[in-house]
């Protein structure tokens, strides 16, 4: 599957450092536009905090809407980094090399964005401290530490800390490379961040062992984070469609599906914007598409299991909710779009190699997947709260306000803005990984055919 490309070190340095040493012409206008969107979003968030949640479409009984849906979505996107970097690093998959750093970055910035939504959803963000530490002793009131709302920030904070450390350890050799190629304040910055890296055998060994250990340590956190997020819903028996024991694995595999698809989207953009055709190649998209076929099919199985579990109990409210999701307007339209975009359109297309190696088709199908996965979270959260029951006299339909949609758009602008800022100071494709790949790969003769192979020393 891997095609042999011989690239010398000078060419690799020149191409992969062009974002840091020579700014592309499109970079500044794009960052300015994104910066304006980010400032507009921050202004809207400030107005909402000042005015209260009354400016949103949230009302009884739908108190969880667009904000919590987007929170779950970004936590799911963050699973891309560990899926691509940690698991594929442990399995020594060669095709991971161009995509590891972008996936790790997506993890860190997605988690930073996800943390914003519970804060603003609280209405009074300054009182979040009461979730983390005891109330004043005079009142004798303490937070319920068994609540998922307490476990969420703990799990996400741990995941964010580990992911940041994981990213930084892998960045050290490239920081030293930049230190040796820059002058002035940039040289001082890279000198501090490189931590005295000289590339001697002892440092390389420690960096390699550190990456493997962090990969292994991050795997249980990777599983636990979205499991805990799923328990925000699974431990609420009063809402139909939420109280399900299958939610933890269902959410985790759905997160991997959306996260890896987001990495495909980002890889295509990196290839087009920075002209990295020699580093991000069609075979990398082919490998990720094969991975996505497996993950998406597993996710589809859990989707059917979740539906079967709901219907198996013959509980009238559960059956009424499923009828509402699939047969009542507008939920039925959203359900059809969700199912088409998350599986029925992209996965059959990925079965053909000419689609898997077509970067444009992979780009658009990966976007379709994340449209579908966002709708999946929306259909899990909102219909269960919005379903009208005969004994609830204070209900209203949920209509997301312009404030909610603006903050939703802000989240995408914010993540993209952070990615472009990072690309200005640090390489998005790890240089040392590319150079190591050139050392490890070679052409070998098998019979009369010459094929690419990975050569490693035996222990």
Each model region followed by its residue ranges:
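Long, contiguous internal "core" modules enriched in hydrophobic/ aromatic residues
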Residues: 18-47, 93, 140-338, 348, ...
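Hydrophobic alpha-helical transmembrane segments
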Residues: 75-83, 337-348, 414-415
